[in-house]
Each structure stands twice: as C-alpha cells, then as structure tokens.
From Swiss-Prot:
GO terms for cellular component: chloroplast thylakoid membrane; photosystem I. May help in the organization of the PsaE and PsaF subunits. GO terms for biological process: photosynthesis. Belongs to the PsaJ family. It is a single-pass membrane protein. Its main location: plastid. InterPro entries: PSI_PsaJ, PSI_PsaJ_sf. Keywords: Chloroplast, Membrane, Photosynthesis, Photosystem I, Plastid, Thylakoid, Transmembrane, Transmembrane helix. This is Photosystem I reaction center subunit IX. The keyword Transferase does not apply. HAMAP family: PSI_PsaJ (MF_00522).
Length: 44
C-alpha cells in the first residue's frame, strides 16, 4: 500500500512537468512559426 501511495504522489508531479514542457515547446514553435498550418521543415 505504501508503494501505491508513492505512485499516487509521483504521477501528478511527473504529468505536470511533462505537460508544462510540452506546452512550452508548443508555445516556442508557435512563436517562431506563427499561425502555421504546415511547417516548412516538414514539407517535402
């Protein structure tokens, strides 16, 4: 039961860090390529 309580306290912290980093990455991509429906580095 102790391990389960540890998991319940670690998972929200890790998910908050992950989603915060993902949001920051999306914000930076949107800053360099504003309103881009297709990104220039993905077009072939």
């Amino acid at each position: 039961m102790r391990d389960f309580k540890t998991y319940l306290s670690v998972a929200p912290v890790l998910s908050t860090l992950w989603f915060g980093a993902l949001a920051g990455l999306l914000i930076e991509i949107n800053r360099f390529f504003p309103d881009a429906l297709t990104f220039p580095f993905f077009s072939f």
